[in-house]
Amino acid sequence: MKQADIYTEALVCLRTILQTDHPEFQNWIDWLERDIQDWNQRREVAHHLRAYGGMGSFNDLPSMRGNHDYIFDFLKSVCYAFGHLYGKREGISPETLMEECLHDAEQAAYHPHKALNQAIAHHLMQGDLQENLDRL
């Protein structure tokens, strides 16, 4: 059963993967924790967007283990797309926008792992991706 919105669930899963696979990157774990708080308290995405780009950015983290690496990259893409578009499209709720970003990433033809994309999207929408990270 869904407990949090999709964006929060995606951020929590990013944090969980990082805590599990690279606990030595406490600065990025803390960064994601702030992103979660910023979103839940103020519906703010600016801090999260600052994580991308430049030397030593979120995009420069080492590989995660197994499918965590693919899931981590998938979630980063979805969260970045959402953060970039949030507040720029009038008349669309954050939840609907996140669903669109998730659908776009899931359906992207250039991704070689269509079944995994669909499984990630399904569990993210259901709010149980965190519990299923090691099953994917």
At which residue positions do the language-model features occur?
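Short terminal alpha-helical segments
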Residues: 1-35, 99-136
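Intrinsically disordered, low-complexity segments enriched in small/polar residues
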Residues: 51-54, 64, 85, 89, ...
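Short, cationic, amphipathic peptide segments
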Residues: 58, 65-69, 84-88, 95, ...
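C-terminal tail/extension regions appended to the core domain(s) of diverse proteins
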Residues: 76-108
